[in-house]
């Protein structure tokens, strides 16, 4: 004899009264009782792609709505073995663009049904400590805007943890990566300045343990050597305001004169350099000295600075990182070759560098536009 399932609305009214008397939260068991189905059927209704009939789904969703039921993410993760949480590792001192990055990542990861759990590093050398914290959480994957070693990558592989490196690269092995071409950016900046007649360069470096800063400096130094120009005077920096003034004074002391151009590891350092040049040393920028930064942070565009700099396409890079990681997670153990998605920096022609097209004999008549503005180094996936 077939039993008729109870009316969902009637059952919900009675059951809500019971829950109120017991002063407890609604569970999937309550939804199952009201809908007249098993608790496992309720669980399947809240699992994307699970097999469930239209009739059962309709009853469960109606019961859940009437009971104000909110699925327990932690309990669901025990069943699906997916937490729908992505860990994001960020070296907090490395780049003032990273608050923008975090917002973009949260948006794009959220659009794919997942949430972000943030881990910050005071310095990139703190990776071991932070990873020890990450392993304590049941995350589905990691986006790391921090420097990882081959040993760290091996640990990700051992744990079968999906990983995407953001704005970092690892030469020793292939890893899923989304990055700006910082080596090319350094070359581009030197090419622009050299084309306008600059000969003597100083570099105020970024954080010593930052691979981004190292790649930018390497690209700039390589390009100067290719053009037959003197090697730059390089002084250390901390990607902060104070490094700009200290670096400018150190470069002038080492050279015995004001250089033609100073390339700074960050915009904040460049702003410190500008303020020192203009207000402490009486150097006219850009007539006597050109100053360039990196990253195009908000303050670099303020009227009092209008900094010559390079901008990373952070929104597009964040979208690519979210898409790549979620694709790897959804692959469910399938094997695919790691991807490397490379983006080009955008040159921002501000008011702190002399950039008239001199094209002297140092560059030579045979140099084409691609050589002046970059190096044309091949990248596995170049995204303009």
Which stretches of residues belong to each language-model region?
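N-terminal helix-turn-helix DNA-binding module of bacterial transcription factors
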Residues: 1-81, 376-378, 383-384
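Flexible loop/turn connectors
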Residues: 5, 13, 232, 250-384
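Hinge/beta->alpha junction and helix N-cap segments in small-molecule ligand-binding domains
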Residues: 91-100, 118-126, 168, 178-188, ...
């Amino acid at each position: 004899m077939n039993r008729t399932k109870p009316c969902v609305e009637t059952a919900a009214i009675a059951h809500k009264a019971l829950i109120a008397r017991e002063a407890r939260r609604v569970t999937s068991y309550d939804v199952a009782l009201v809908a007249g189905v098993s608790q496992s059927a309720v669980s399947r209704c809240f699992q994307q792609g699970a097999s469930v009939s239209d009739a059962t789904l309709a009853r469960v969703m109606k019961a859940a709505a009437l009971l104000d039921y909110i699925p327990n993410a932690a309990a669901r993760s025990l069943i699906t073995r997916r937490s729908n949480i992505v860990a994001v590792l960020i070296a907090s001192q490395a780049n003032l663009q990273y608050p923008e990055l975090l917002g973009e990542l949260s948006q794009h990861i959220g659009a794919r049904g997942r949430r972000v759990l943030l881990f910050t590093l005071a310095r990139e050398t703190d990776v071991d400590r932070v990873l020890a914290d990450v392993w304590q959480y049941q995350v589905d994957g990691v986006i790391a805007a921090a420097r990882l070693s081959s040993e760290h990558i091996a640990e990700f592989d051992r744990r079968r943890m999906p990983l995407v490196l953001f704005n970092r690269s690892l030469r020793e092995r292939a890893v899923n990566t989304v990055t700006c071409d910082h080596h090319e950016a350094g070359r581009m900046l030197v090419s622009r300045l050299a084309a306008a007649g600059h000969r003597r360069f100083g570099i105020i470096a970024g954080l010593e343990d930052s691979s981004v800063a190292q790649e930018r400096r390497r690209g700039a130094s390589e390009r100067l050597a290719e053009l037959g120009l003197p090697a730059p005077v390089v002084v250390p920096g901390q990607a902060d305001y104070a490094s700009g003034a200290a670096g400018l004074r150190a470069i002038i002391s080492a050279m015995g004169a004001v250089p033609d151009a100073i390339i700074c590891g960050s915009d904040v350092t460049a702003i410190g350099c500008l303020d020192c040049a203009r207000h402490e040393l009486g150097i006219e920028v850009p007539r006597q000295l050109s100053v360039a930064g990196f990253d195009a942070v908000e303050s670099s565009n303020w009227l009092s600075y209008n900094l010559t700099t390079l901008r990373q396409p952070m929104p597009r890079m964040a979208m690519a990182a979210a898409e790549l990681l979620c694709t790897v997670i959804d692959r469910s153990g399938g094997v695919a070759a790691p991807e490397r998605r490379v983006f080009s920096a955008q040159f921002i022609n501000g008011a702190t560098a002399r950039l008239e097209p001199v094209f002297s004999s140092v560059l030579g008549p045979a140099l084409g536009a691609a050589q002046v503005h970059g190096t044309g180094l091949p990248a596995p996936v170049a995204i303009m």
